[in-house]
Amino acid sequence: MFHMIAYASMRTDIPAFYSDWLVRRIEEGFVMVRSPYNDHLIYKLPFNPEVIDCLGFCTKDPGEMIPHLDALKNWKTLWHVTITPYGKEYEPGVRDKRDIISAFKNLSLRVGKDRVVWRYDPVFLSPLFSISSHKIWFSTLSSLLEGYTDRVIFSFLDIYPFLKDNMQRLGIRAPEKSEMEELALFFVEEGRKHGLIVSSCAEGHWMKDFGIDTSGCLTKDVWEKCAERKLNFPNKKGKRGECNCILGFDIGGYGGCGMKCVYCYGRNYDRNEVHNPLSPLLFGWPRKEDEIKDVKAESWADKDGWLI
């Protein structure tokens, strides 16, 4: 049995670029996902709030989804919205940050600030962004988002091997340990001024003594708060050693993200030409040689375990 938490998506920005497709999947009540490990294996997952306990979103721009929020009125949702200080030189496809902040606030007013989390990541240093720059921007954004969320998550840049040459060309580097400590201490102190719980993502637990929540950004407690129910997870341990996060069933696919961030691990090759909002798959259509595997789906909600 697969996770009855669905995630849209760590692989590409579905809310920003594929909202019409997502709404159609909701209307038809199922979604297909091609395995990233086997190109001829497709999982078919029931896609309705009776079996999906929580639907998580990860996006740099929730604006395109706001007109579709009525389609999600019966769903329990959690939104991670990334707002960084970086400009077009690093995030060429991201709209003006003032528009993103406006969309963040609008989303918060519609779904509730407890369901919208601000992500300030990845944190890196470059000729354009110093320690001081991050302090100024984090303080500014914390002030602008005050009252619209109660949590901020940050992480430091991980440089994947296939990105190393590009990072060196742009002068981008991960902070040194002492620089991480300086920023982490500033983030937690500044965040508290604006009513924010400050959490780290997959950074281990070395910042716990700073007052930072290092448990993880998608833990059992987080998902239960989203579902408003106790959830009977088949495996209560997370998959990553750095945190206790429980990752949902990702309905996205790699490629096709128009943000084209220079630091992204999702590889920015263009798959828009194979996207069709009528297809049950995000990219392409099922092929005759594909194996389609029906996912056994059942809600994990404890029928007597209401949290509210």
Predicted regions, residues:
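N-terminal [4Fe-4S]-dependent radical SAM core
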Residues: 1-7, 15, 48, 211-254, ...
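Surface-exposed cleft-lining segments at the edges of enzyme active sites
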Residues: 86-94, 122-132, 167-175
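Active-site beta-loop-alpha junctions enriched in small/polar residues
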Residues: 11-13, 60-62, 82-86, 121-123, ...
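Local cysteine-cluster metal-coordination motifs and their immediate loop/turn environment
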Residues: 249-269
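Conserved C-terminal portion of the radical SAM core fold
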Residues: 99-166, 186-202
